[in-house]
Amino acid sequence: MKYFLLITSILFMSMKTNACSFAPGYFGFDAAPDQFEIKMDKGIIALLPEPKVTIDKIIRGSASVGSSCEDAGMIHLSTEWPESNVYNINEIGFYFQSENGVDPDLIFPLIPVKGKIKNNTAKFFFVWLDGHPKYQKKLDFKVNVFAVNKGLQIGMPATITIKENEG
């Protein structure tokens, strides 16, 4: 019996395992309405403009579900913020919401998020379980991207189309 346990233990310790883990491609945005001070622009309450959103890259899963990392889909986006706005890009977050309210693969978080900021651009990437190409749903949906400040004021949306490449 003790040899059985020893051999079983050795087998489990020597089994090759693959794991997949992505660091989030975004950070939480902390709203603080009770500590927020409204900013003025030429004597008028400053509004949040529509961000300029660019789809940098869409990567589809290439392996069967359960494969390590290769079944993940990724969407890389950039949001450019106007330098002329009274709110700095460090003071705002962004909501990503499917235009019809239904995110087909739960790609985007339900809360406002911040991206990795460089100059006046925030970079994001979103990961979802995409699976083998044989079983993938076609990507073709619209996403509204809203800026939000710490007082939970929401700006005008930019609408982008997430669509898989043709051919």
Q: At which residue positions do the language-model features occur?
A:
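Extracellular fibronectin type III
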Residues: 151-165
